[in-house]
Structure formats: C-alpha cells, structure tokens
Amino acid sequence: MTIEGDGKEYELLEKWAKDFDCKGHYSCEIGVRQGYGSKLIMDNVKNNYMHVGVDPYGELKYQHHDRTFTEGWPEFFRGSFAADYTDQMRDTMLKDMYEYRNQGKFTLANMTDTMFMCHPAWNEKTYAFVYLDGPHMTKDVLTEAVWFANRSAPHTRIVIDDTDKMETSVIAHVLTYFDFKTIEMGDTKICLEKK
C-alpha cells in the first residue's frame, strides 16, 4: 500500500498533527483525493474518535480556485474543469485505507462539502482537527471554516491548504471571531488554533 499526495508542505501538516490531542472528538479532511493527508492526520493525532474524509469523486466540474479562467468554454463552465478525481481513485483509496477502516479509524463521506455540511449525520459532531483541502475558492473555504468553527472543540486546529489560491487573510480574520488565531504559515498552508 503506497498512499501518495499531490500537494506541498506535507511536513507542516504532519508537524501540526503530531501528538495533537483530539480528546475524543473527530478529525476531518475535506478533499481526500488519494488519502495521504488523512493518513498523515490519523498517524499523528492522538485520541480522535474517528477521522472523516469528505470527497465526492466522480469527476465533477467546478471552479477550483478564485483566479481560474478557462477561455473558450461556455459561461456556465468558465473557471471549471473536471479533475481526475475519478470513482476509480476513490475505490483505490478505500482499498489503501482498509486497515484504518477495519480498525474503525476512517470513514468516507462520499459527497460534496456542501452535502456534508447539510447532512444530519455530521452536523452535530464536534471536530478537533480539520484539514481543508477541497475546493480552493475563498467563498467555499470560508463557508467550510465557519461551519467547522461552529462545531469546534476547545483548541481545535484548522489547517488550510493551497493558501496561494485564495484570500487566506480574509478567512483567518473571520475565524478570529470564533477565537481562532494563526499559529504558523508556510508557503501554501496555514494552521489556525482555537484559543
């Protein structure tokens, strides 16, 4: 089993998750892809009830980040493109995550972030470690961050990926209203922690 990642600065995600005590609450990743971020979190945090991976797969067309523009496409699809997030990728990831699933450490919510946030099964949980690596538009990440902030445990950490593709300062500022502060930034990742 070789679970790979396609991003940068995974060493920061590992550092921020290392020995972080979830105190019996959930951890979550929006945008699982091949599962490397989720694996790093599960291998490093302590005392999480379960890790939830959220990803719809299925080659959906959507705008991935604020500054995407695809010339020549109809207005409806401008800024959108189908990524290689196929159902086959999902099936491979689930096989690779078999040990974690078998031990009750991982479950996949095979749906969009919007569906996840509206789903009653996930709406009333408390989350202690969150990794936002799905849609990278400011408005989407802001919506996710506020949703998780409203369901956060004391000292929850929210890690945001691909910060160079969105207005991260806006998101960090809004999270101050939920008592989150930035504890460290890399070139493409930021970690915020609830006071």
Residue spans for each PLM region:
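S-adenosylmethionine/decaboxylated-SAM
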Residues: 3-195
